[in-house]
Amino acid sequence: MKKHRRRVASGVSLSGQLPTGPARGTGSIRTDAGRYLQAAARDDAPARFGSPPGEVDDTARRVWEVAFGLAVRRRFEPDAPLAEISRAVARSVHEHAAAALPMMDAEMLVRAALGETVPLAEIDPDVQVGVHLLPFASIADELALGDEELELLVAEAELG
């Protein structure tokens, strides 16, 4: 089976705004932000280490946050031990070492996605984007999400 990958143009604005008109089908990714996230999860995004090139609007950030939360909740039980979360975050941060993501911030974002109340106000928005993209990719890989499963997850996040 041949894999089809869509390249995401670099240096352009990324938006999470849904286009007008009917959906192309169940599970179909409809936003630039969704396509970028899918490409990042498949290690096919133009900016693999850190924030994507160009402008990122709030709706794109929201799509990535929701997708990250969906993936985190698939990977961890709500009452997962902190040690399990810490080990998984450490592996992910190490895997994407070139992005220099702060481990504690990444761990707090995972814990917040699991419903824990943690202080997020001090986390830099660019760090949040990096965590929502790169550890998301690690979790998608760990869960062995196939192309269809990943597309469904991202499409669900776009609906938010």
Give short role names for the model-derived ranges.
Residues 82-109:
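Charged low-complexity stretches with an acidic bias
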